[in-house]
């Protein structure tokens, strides 16, 4: 369910059944991981690991949270908007990513990201966050130094973008990813309207795409990946 409250309740059920047989807790995101950590694992000193490197989880490493994985959200957010910026400017897609732009923005392939030509996709690379390095990740909304330079508006003029987040209640998306997007949009001269979905229905998002003609570009985060036609049918009109 990816739901923190459900995870907190689940650990109570599991401990009632298994008690001290539980040696480690591993969660697919920090929202659920922190819920189980606070509800039971912290007091019982059971190592708990999550995913996303949310600020509260990173801070909790000092209190016994076992660790988490940074999705390099600062790179993810930059790549999302940078690909749009390059398309709008009509420049090579790799500009400011693997190839320096005029402002000096450039990522390191193999360290920060990888590119799949076959899939035509950029992927931010994960980083383990542990007791040894967690202090480097305490601000999850800080832009990445390598790509923090302002673009020249005479070469990259202001453009308007419609961007949705499929679930506004998701801890990572709302507390880390969207704030990072908002920190990058000004650097890339993009005026972005952010739309938060309910995580359940596509119509909760598409109903707020009433006038696509006023936008220069779109970044779509679908609830279900087989629902692309819900958006293309609107954008093709």
Located regions from the model:
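Hinge/beta->alpha junction and helix N-cap segments in small-molecule ligand-binding domains
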Residues: 1-12, 26-32, 52-55, 71-77, ...
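Hydrophobic alpha-helical
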Residues: 2-59, 181, 218, 223-236
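Short loop/turn motifs at secondary-structure junctions
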Residues: 21, 64, 213-216
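Exported/periplasmic ABC-transporter solute-binding proteins
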Residues: 23-27, 38-110, 131
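Short, solvent-exposed loop/turn elements at domain surfaces
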Residues: 58, 135-140, 170-175
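Hinge/cleft segment of the Venus flytrap/periplasmic-binding protein
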Residues: 79, 83-159
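Alpha-helical recognition/docking segments in bacterial nutrient-uptake
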Residues: 152-171, 175-237
